[in-house]
Amino acid sequence: MISIIIAYSTPEKQVEIPLTVEESCTLVVAVKRSGILQQFPEINLSQAIVGIHNKRTALDAGLRDGDRIEIYRPLTMDPKQARLLRAKRGKIRRMVRGEAG
């Protein structure tokens, strides 16, 4: 038997579920056994991106003792768009402080 953690977070809360599973258990089986899909019905496991210790991983991946399985939420904004918005905000702040450049 191995000990793992299933992790998921929303903007409101973060959940970590400790779980003990067989050494032959796959990621998808562990997630289903954890009960997290009942706690968060918005998780669509067939479309969700999952990882182990912040590294993207396939659902059929094997597990090791101490693994932290993370279920990632979809992005709310395109990363390029987010960078552009941050850059514009930074430029406006510099202009307000008189650091225009």
UniProtKB/Swiss-Prot annotation:
Transmembrane segments: none
Family: Belongs to the UPF0125 (RnfH) family.
Protein name: Protein RnfH
Annotated organism of origin: Coxiella burnetii (strain CbuK_Q154)
Taxonomic path: Bacteria, Pseudomonadati, Pseudomonadota, Gammaproteobacteria, Legionellales
Gene that specifies this protein: rnfH
